[in-house]
Amino acid sequence: MDSTKYESLSKYIRGNIQQWKKDSMKNCNYQCIFTGNKDFQIHHLYGVSNILNDIVNNYHIVIKNNINDYSKDELHYILNIFIKEQSKYPLGVCIRKEIHVLFHSLYGQYYNTPEQWYQFQKDYTNGIYDDIIKNKIA
């Protein structure tokens, strides 16, 4: 599935999953899990595009070109299904922007999985990426 089809809906959903974000930050003690820095982004272990693809296929959601093409009831329905599906997966992890960019440069921007994350976390912890990020993280 072409991930660009989901851009409008993805932006809407990302702006409306505050509880998941709060829970993810709390789970990471409000800091990057690698550096302890308080400046971080939240990485979805099971990507937003994966969840959107799942709910589009399983619930026969019609993808519209613009978020304004959905009714409030449709958006509420989609968001509730998304939150339900998202709860099946691990919370997000808090990581520095530079580390987040590194992950996606290695594994792509869309359709990421927990398995990719666990491999990245292992490699990061083992120093595999030290040379790449040496000058990017203070």
Label each residue range with its predicted role.
Residues 16-67, 98:
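Short cysteine-rich loop/turn motifs with clustered Cys
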Residues 64-114:
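Short Cys/His-centered divalent metal-binding micro-motifs
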Residues 18-19, 31, 41, 86, ...:
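Residue-identity detector for glutamine
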Residues 4, 9-17, 48-52, 56, ...:
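Generic hydrophobic, helix-prone segments enriched in Leu/Val/Ile
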Residues 1-39, 125-138:
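A boundary/linker detector
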Residues 3, 8-10, 24, 49, ...:
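Generic serine detector
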Residues 102-138:
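Active-site or metal-binding loop neighborhoods of secreted/extracellular toxin and effector enzymes
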